[in-house]
């Protein structure tokens, strides 16, 4: 099931053991190498400390929020050595410029949709400049079109670029 970015922030974290809220998931931790949500920055309900909830510890996404087994699944950021680099990047997708491989500027990421069964970001929604909005509107980019991601821009395959099909190559058609 795809979820938009605004529905992935400020979520209650519910404990299945106690049946109550144990934390609030403030914003997702996005891995820019594979566009996967690796976890969430959380605010502890009791001590108000910042903790990390890993995606592997989420049992289900219910209307009340994110369901986890117990409070023990929340980790202190310093304990997550393998994720330290990703956590320190604090990569945020919204607002990043999107250009094509031919250096044509498409706009900026205004929203994204993530598949909550795999935690991969599937679609990027690009808001275009005003002069392009009148004729084109909002662009949707699938994750398969992405070539490269850097902290300040995303490079995608140009949609106007003609790709020769393998059948056309065999027949000698240009």
Which residues does each PLM region occupy?
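Peripheral interaction segments used for macromolecular assembly
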Residues: 1-174
């Amino acid at each position: 099931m795809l979820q938009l970015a605004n529905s992935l922030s400020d979520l209650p974290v519910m404990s299945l053991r106690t049946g109550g809220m144990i934390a609030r998931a403030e914003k997702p931790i996005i891995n820019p190498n594979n566009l996967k949500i690796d976890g969430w920055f959380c605010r502890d309900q009791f001590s108000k400390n910042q903790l990390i909830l890993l995606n592997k510890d989420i049992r289900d996404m219910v209307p009340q929020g994110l369901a986890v087994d117990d409070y023990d699944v929340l980790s202190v950021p310093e304990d997550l050595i393998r994720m330290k680099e990703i956590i320190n990047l604090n990569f945020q997708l919204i607002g990043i410029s999107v250009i094509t491989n031919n250096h044509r500027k498409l706009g900026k990421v205004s929203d994204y949709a993530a598949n909550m069964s795999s935690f991969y970001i599937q679609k990027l929604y690009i808001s275009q400049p005003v002069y392009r909005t009148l004729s084109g509107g909002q662009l949707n980019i699938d994750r398969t079109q992405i070539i490269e991601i850097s902290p300040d821009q995303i490079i995608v395959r140009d949609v106007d670029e003609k790709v020769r099909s393998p059948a056309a190559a065999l027949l000698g058609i240009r």
